[in-house]
Amino acid sequence: GVHDVWIIDGLAYSSNWADGVHIVDVGATKLNEADRSKNQYNPFLAMAGQGSPGNPVKLGEMKDPNGHNHAAFPFISQSSDKFYIIAGDEYGGEFGMAGGFHFLDFTDPNNPEETAVYQVPEAGSHNHWVHGDTLLASYYQGGLRVVDISGELMGDIYAQGREIAYFNSSDPKGYVANRPNVWGTMPYKGLIYFSDMNNGLW
């Protein structure tokens, strides 16, 4: 079933656990080749133009063999112009220390492939946001992680040392003392905000 949907430019990016990521035209305006000179290029917008909220049209998909696809965020690399969907796992928050963020290269929408993953070994992933070529990752027990995702994205991003910042939001006066439980994050006016289910809004 559907767990989460992100809609931008009339395209719905649906996260469906084991069914993975689906890209659906729900009212997108078709772009043509000439738009490449004016916009970073989303290949699904080149395929769009037939769907509507009452008549959605599926344009692409990629299954999740692990069965834990929780959230999907479209990302056009500022440095390589490749089109990715970053698919986040969820394995159970307080009860699980697993999951990561999978970089699905949809530059060729008919032949998507997973090229990279960012996974903190000791923590479980939840929501995420992309700002420019930077990933903001909510990592339950692992706090907030800020990751450089510029350039070529291949292999184990965590092992490559791309993490550029980390914030541990544990608090001795929290709902569960001295334990972060970061749920979601987003940037706004030069700051990063995130919610922690044990320790409030930061």
What do the PLM-derived regions correspond to, one by one?
Residues G1-W202:
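Feature marking well-ordered beta-strand scaffolds used for ligand recognition
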